[in-house]
Amino acid sequence: MRESSQIRETTETKIKLSLQLDEGKNVSVQTGVGFFDHMLTLFARHGRFGLQVEAEGDVFVDAHHTVEDVGIVLGNCLKKALQNKEGINRYGSAYVPMDESLGFVAIDISGRSYIVFQGELTNPKLGDFDTELTEEFFRAVAHTANITLHARILYGSNTHHKIEALFKAFGRALREAVERNAHITGVNSTKGML
């Protein structure tokens, strides 16, 4: 089974995270940031991933360090779980509606970190979650996993729905990208490596 775990401790956060790419039954998320827990759970369920997260952070300041560091650790675990990337689709994309909102995510497991994030989040805060942290999370994942990630909110009026559509689309796009494909021999690249 393709899986990875990491514990990362800094003066700001302590993150313990385990990711299973091929087994999606066990999802448990506790970061101390309620809305973020909800989004990570949606990502895992819609991507059919196993995900266990325990995070302690300086949320008395704000949720920035916790959200960003969870993204860093998730990216590291994704990179490690994929190992040599042989036999996977490499690319994945998904449109996901959430009522009036529509989110889109496209992923290339390319070995090159890059992110494009587009979307207007009109409500600056949802519970104790600063909505601008949505982009920070995706940036952290993309950079540490060495993937190219395009995340776009096409339209919508409810900020919760917009972010939820993105996290669900992220799960579905990543599922497609990491899926093993019997028609792909070796690495899905003319270079012979990623």
Swiss-Prot record:
InterPro entries: IGPD_sf (IPR038494), ImidazoleglycerolP_deHydtase (IPR000807), ImidazoleglycerP_deHydtase_CS (IPR020565), Ribosomal_Su5_D2-typ_SF (IPR020568). HAMAP family: HisB. SUPFAM superfamilies: Ribosomal protein S5 domain 2-like (SSF54211). Its EC number is 4.2.1.19. The keyword Coiled coil does not apply. This is Imidazoleglycerol-phosphate dehydratase. It is an enzyme of class 4 (lyase). It comes from the Bacteria. GO terms for molecular function: imidazoleglycerol-phosphate dehydratase activity. Pathway: Amino-acid biosynthesis; L-histidine biosynthesis; L-histidine from 5-phospho-alpha-D-ribose 1-diphosphate: step 6/9. It catalyses: D-erythro-1-(imidazol-4-yl)glycerol 3-phosphate = 3-(imidazol-4-yl)-2-oxopropyl phosphate + H2O. Pfam families: IGPD. It comes from Bacillus cereus (strain AH820). Keywords: Amino-acid biosynthesis, Cytoplasm, Histidine biosynthesis, Lyase. Belongs to the imidazoleglycerol-phosphate dehydratase family. One of its GO terms (biological process) is L-histidine biosynthetic process. One of its GO terms (cellular component) is cytoplasm. Its main location: cytoplasm.
